[in-house]
Amino acid sequence: MRKESFDEIKPWENNILLWVKQRKTISETIDAQREAFRDALNSIVIQKGWTVWIDEAKYLSQMLGLKEELTYCVEQLRSIDSTVICGAQRPAFLPPSVLAGSTHVFLWKTTDRRDQEKLSDIGGIDASIVRNEAKSLGKHEFIYIKSRGTTSHTTISQTPK
């Protein structure tokens, strides 16, 4: 097995970070973000073969009003050799297919009832176990769930106390 450190990994040349500059008002900024992200997602669907990282899927879905586009990407992009990775601080406000259609899910501690209820959208697992474990996680612990394939797996990280 080859070991690599961060200073040995070569930079990738084909990365794109979409960052919309602040406008005069919040409303103008949100409008500009909505247009830029909608155009980017449409281009990704046409071009195929992308890996898309959406850092705050709740913001994209709710604030920018792109729930339909996010749902489409999560449900359809794998059929065109593309991957969607969604990050979110609050699972309660994600479209249902974001969790239900995920192959890999990483969860950190949550005690919010709405977030815990949303975890039942993860396919192929016992939601009550995940909800209970998610409440009791320590500061640096997380739950990893592989929800696709012939069987589902749930792993809880262990950190030294």
Give residue ranges: language-model regions:
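Conserved P-loop NTPase motor cores
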Residues: 30-127
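Hydrophobic beta-strand segments of well-ordered beta-sheets in folded domains
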Residues: 14-17, 50-52, 142
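P-loop NTPase motor core of the ASCE superfamily
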Residues: 72-74, 104-106, 116-161
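Conserved P-loop NTPase mechanochemical-coupling segment
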Residues: 9-32
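Flexible, charged surface loops at secondary-structure boundaries
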Residues: 9-14, 43-48, 136-138
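A broadly conserved detector of short glycine/acidic/proline-rich loop/turn motifs that flank catalytic sites
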Residues: 22, 111-112, 148-149
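Walker A/P-loop NTP-binding active-site region of P-loop NTPases
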Residues: 1-11
